[in-house]
Regions:
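An alpha-helical, amphipathic repeat domain used for nucleic-acid recognition
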Residues: 1-158
Length: 158
């Protein structure tokens, strides 16, 4: 039902306000939804302008909540968060504001926790293979490779 075409701007505006009220949305998310509904470009621009004016859509707020959520819930690193925000066409300024919400000490604790989780799962006896697999896992999670290798060296020496 939610993906049916919408022909009335007032209905579209109410539906998109409900969509934005569920969780923070960025302009890209809203435009994707409006495109699904088959609205004309002028109508989409007008609706988006109203949503921004009424604070239903706020790129900075979105970047902050997205960064916090992906880090705390999914344990994503800053690189993966940055790439996803860029994919959603968020400005670099807003991305940096969002990433600054992540506490560096907490970031390092999560990195160490993921290191230990992966290390406990691996069955390889070869230390080189083991370190490489851990590094690949952590960089795929979006952690910076210099931090990953520093942590691997630090924890492997123990």
């Amino acid at each position: 039902m939610h993906n049916k075409r919408v022909y009335d701007i007032s209905i579209a505006l109410e539906r998109i306000k409900n969509y934005c009220a569920l969780q923070d949305r960025c302009q890209w998310d809203v435009l994707q939804k409006l495109n699904e509904w088959g609205l004309q470009q002028a109508t989409k621009d007008h609706i988006l302008e109203l949503l921004i004016t009424d604070k239903f859509v706020d790129e900075e707020r979105f970047a902050v909540s997205f960064s916090r959520g992906k880090f705390r819930i999914k344990n994503w690193g800053k690189r993966k968060i940055t790439n996803e925000l860029k994919r959603k066409q968020i400005s670099i300024i807003c991305i940096n504001i969002g990433l600054n919400e992540i506490d560096n000490n907490e970031y390092k604790k999560v990195l160490e926790k993921l290191f230990h989780q992966k290390n406990n799962i691996l069955k390889d006896k070869n230390h080189f293979t083991r370190k490489t697999k851990i590094a690949n896992f952590l960089t795929q999670r979006g952690f910076e490779s210099n931090l990953v290798w520093d942590k691997i060296r630090e924890l492997s020496d123990k």
